[in-house]
């Protein structure tokens, strides 16, 4: 595992975007695994800026998103489909038919998960997987206690994750309780993994996940077993680690 220290959120975002852009330049038809949430937004903004300058071409890129809320239409502003289009896809020349996000409106969980696994396998896997890091160590929506052998599945979100997502909704009752997510096995099958972390509130979980024991109680700890993981984190998130 390689850890890159960034000065602040802006620096973290730029360093992460550099890694993603290098992947696109080296392999124009690459498969990128993408994440949502607040942490990756800065990296997406930087990628858009480089695209607008003519430095990046997304026309051959394929994307696979980690997760989607169950029961929310993709046109809803709270859906991850909406998020990805707003933050990235609508601003670059990626072909929409090459962007994949779990179908949150598929009522049959088994069908939704099987369909998504089929897409991932058909594409030959992910070249570079982008991840955020939850306060409880979740990656994607893989909550503490989840088995490492899972591929795509329907998850009941933890109370902590629901509370963390409340800031995006008008009321707590509106926050979805379930989501479709790529499992740990799917994430770990990526050729390369990039984790972005920012803020002093993530310092404890950075130390626990990346320097503590490997355990399902801390899903992100499994990343210690992957042979090509880069963590880009700002100084606040790394504040509990030795220099």
Task: Go through each PLM region and give its residues.
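N-terminal glycine-/serine-/threonine-rich phosphate-binding loop
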Residues: 1-32
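ATP/nucleoside-binding phosphotransfer catalytic cores, i.e., glycine-rich phosphate-binding loops
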Residues: 185, 189-243
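A glycine- and small-aliphatic-rich helix-loop capping segment at beta-alpha/alpha-beta transitions
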Residues: 45-57, 80, 144-153, 212-214
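Class I SAM-dependent methyltransferase SAM-binding "motif I" and its flanking Rossmann-like core
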Residues: 136, 140-184
């Amino acid at each position: 595992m390689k850890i890159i220290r960034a000065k602040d959120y802006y620096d973290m975002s730029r360093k992460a975007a550099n890694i993603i852009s290098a992947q696109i330049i080296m392999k124009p038809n690459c498969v990128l695994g993408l994440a949502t949430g607040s942490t990756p937004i800065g990296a997406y903004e930087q990628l858009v800026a480089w695209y607008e300058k003519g430095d990046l071409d997304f026309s051959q890129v394929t994307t696979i998103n980690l997760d989607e809320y169950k029961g929310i239409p993709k046109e809803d502003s709270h859906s991850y489909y909406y998020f990805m289009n707003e933050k990235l896809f609508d601003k670059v020349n990626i072909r929409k038919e090459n962007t994949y996000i779990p179908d949150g409106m598929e009522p049959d969980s088994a069908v939704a998960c099987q369909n998504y696994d089929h897409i991932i396998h058909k594409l030959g896997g992910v070249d570079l997987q982008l991840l955020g890091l939850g306060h409880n160590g979740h990656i994607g929506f893989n909550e503490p206690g989840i088995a490492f052998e899972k591929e795509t599945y329907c998850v009941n979100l933890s109370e902590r994750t629901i509370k963390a997502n409340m800031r995006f909704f008008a009321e707590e009752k509106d926050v979805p309780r379930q989501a479709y997510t790529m499992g740990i096995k799917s994430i770990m099958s990526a050729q390369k993994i990039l984790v972005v972390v920012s803020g002093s509130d993530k310092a404890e979980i950075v130390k626990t996940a990346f320097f503590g024991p490997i355990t399902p109680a801390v899903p992100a700890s499994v990343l210690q077993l992957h042979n090509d993981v880069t963590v880009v984190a700002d100084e606040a998130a790394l504040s509990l680690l030795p220099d």
